[in-house]
A protein has these predicted regions:
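Bacterial N-terminal signal peptides
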Residues: 9-20
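Mid-chain, well-packed structural core segment of small domains
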Residues: 90-107
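Edge beta-strand at a domain terminus
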Residues: 123-144
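N-terminal secretory signal peptides that target proteins for export/translocation
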Residues: 1-6
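Short beta-strand segments that buttress and anchor functional surface loops
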Residues: 40-42, 88-95, 116-122
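Short, surface-exposed coil-to-beta transition loops
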Residues: 98-103, 116-118, 129-133
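Short, solvent-exposed loop/hinge segments that bridge or flank secondary-structure elements
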Residues: 39-76
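N-terminal helix-cap/turn-to-beta initiation motif at the start of protein domains
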Residues: 24-37, 81
Length: 144
């Protein structure tokens, strides 16, 4: 009887200590992204004077962490995966004469982000153009 009582006490102590910690180890699909307005810069790699950096303000959140303007007409997000602090994606934009597919990753650290985007643009009757961009960004405040 005494052994059983000790094991019940041990078990209850274990659960009282473990349960509060279990949320720390639970598999979450959240990244350390502070939601709000983000200033995102895409710089072609290697940098050239022919291509100026692309700078845009985007509203990012846990549900929309991909730092690309997916709401642009003709653009859609094909896949999105989150691993640790990093979001990986594949997106596609279709316009009249060409299709651009981008494969990217962005690693968040609360108020900043770094990553890379590779684009492949194909147009009817032309060679596919491939470009690689370095992605950087900082949170600027709340979305408007």
């Amino acid at each position: 009887m005494r052994v059983r009582r000790l094991s019940l006490i041990t078990l209850s102590i274990f659960w009282s200590l473990f349960l509060p910690l279990s949320s720390c180890f639970a598999a979450k699909n959240e990244i350390p992204l502070k939601e709000g307005a983000w200033n995102i810069t895409l710089q072609i790699n290697p940098p050239t004077s022919d291509f100026l950096p692309i700078v845009q303000m985007l509203c990012l959140s846990q549900t929309e962490p991909v730092p690309i303007p997916a709401k642009k007409e003709g653009c859609r997000l094909l896949t999105k995966e989150i691993e640790g602090n990093t979001v990986f994606w594949v997106a596609e934009c279709r316009e009249k004469e060409f299709v651009t597919r981008s494969v990217g990753n962005a690693t968040y650290d609360s108020n900043k982000v770094e990553g890379a985007v590779q684009t492949m643009t194909s147009a009817t009757g032309k060679e596919t153009e491939m470009r690689t961009y370095t992605l950087t960004g900082k949170r600027q405040g709340n979305c408007r």
